[in-house]
Swiss-Prot record:
May be a substrate-recognition component of a SCF-like ECS (Elongin-Cullin-SOCS-box protein) E3 ubiquitin-protein ligase complex which mediates the ubiquitination and subsequent proteasomal degradation of target proteins. It comes from Mus musculus (Mouse). This is Ankyrin repeat and SOCS box protein 13. SUPFAM superfamilies: Ankyrin repeat, SOCS box-like. Signal peptide: none annotated. GO terms for biological process: intracellular signal transduction; protein ubiquitination. Pfam families: Ank, Ank_2, SOCS_box. The keyword Repeat applies. Belongs to the ankyrin SOCS box (ASB) family.
Length: 278
């Protein structure tokens, strides 16, 4: 028999959810009053579906902050993993809910869970929530966490064209030339044909001559005479100035949280603005 929506079943990549509990349903829908009644009556807040989805996963993925709070207060496992290895913090970041992210972190959620797939920071970059990205970095998220499918968070942000997230990552000290199969963030920017993104990456020191596993430079993924192609052509003919190269070198030397270090330098405000890419 085919699963039906009314049965609480969901056909997915791995299989399908069956017999989702009333706690799962209330958490996902944001029905906080019903959820509280279920908790008060002794319902288990850590019961999982066949895909190892807990009610906390369900609430986090939908950005249901009030339900997340109720579940955590009732003893929900903050770092429970589903069948894909994702934690509720990963799901909260995927939803872009800063409220859920803050709640989970306040209950001790790991910002860098040992995963081979997307980390919370990857998920925040996918959703395009620069606010979540900034918060995760502030509490110690690994800027170079490597996802076996996507690469680093910077790769993800560039592939999804989330420029605000890209700038937050770069200002925090993310490696602009980090590679996955020799493919850099600049290759992604070229593929999505985003001139603003291309310029930003180059200004932060992106290598326009980097070659991927096919032996292609970023410019090889642009069409002749297109705006992205002309952008690469300009930077090939007009390399970064000495002042720009000095900025790249200094920011690289300051490492993670470089922006904070730059702001404390005893130099003129105009230089601080320049080094901060303002």
């Amino acid at each position: 028999m085919e699963p039906r929506a009314g049965d609480g079943c969901f056909l997915g990549d791995v299989g399908f959810w069956v017999e989702r509990t009333p706690v799962h349903e209330a958490a996902q829908r944001g029905e906080s009053l019903q959820l509280q009644q279920l908790i008060d009556s002794g319902a288990c807040v850590n019961q999982v579906t066949v895909d190892s989805i807990t009610p906390l996963h369900a609430a986090s993925l939908q950005g249901q902050a009030q339900c997340v709070q109720l579940l955590l207060a009732a003893g929900a496992q903050v770092d429970a993993r589903n069948i894909d290895g994702s934690t509720p913090l990963c799901d909260a970041c995927a939803s872009g809910s800063i409220e859920c992210v803050k709640l989970l972190l306040s209950y001790g959620a790991k910002v860098n869970p040992p995963l081979y797939t997307a980390s919370p920071l990857h998920e925040a970059c996918m959703s395009g929530s620069s606010e979540c990205v900034r918060l995760l970095i502030d509490v110690g998220a690994n800027l170079e966490a490597h996802d076996c499918h996507f690469g680093t968070p910077l790769h993800v942000a560039c592939a999804r064209e989330h420029l605000d997230c890209v700038k937050v990552l770069l200002n925090a000290g993310a490696n602009v030339n980090a590679a996955k199969l020799h493919e850099t963030a600049l290759h992604h920017a070229a593929k999505v044909k985003n001139v603003d993104l291309i310029e930003m990456l180059i200004e932060f020191g992106g290598n326009i001559y980097a070659r991927d596993n096919r032996g292609k430079k970023p410019s090889d993924y642009t069409w002749s005479s297109s705006a992205p192609a002309k952008c690469f052509e300009y930077y090939e003919k007009t390399p970064l100035s000495l002042s720009q190269l000095c900025r790249v070198s200094l920011r690289k030397a300051t490492g993670v949280r470089g922006l904070e270090k730059v702001a404390k330098l005893n130099i003129p405000p105009r230089l601080i603005d320049y080094l901060s890419y303002n």
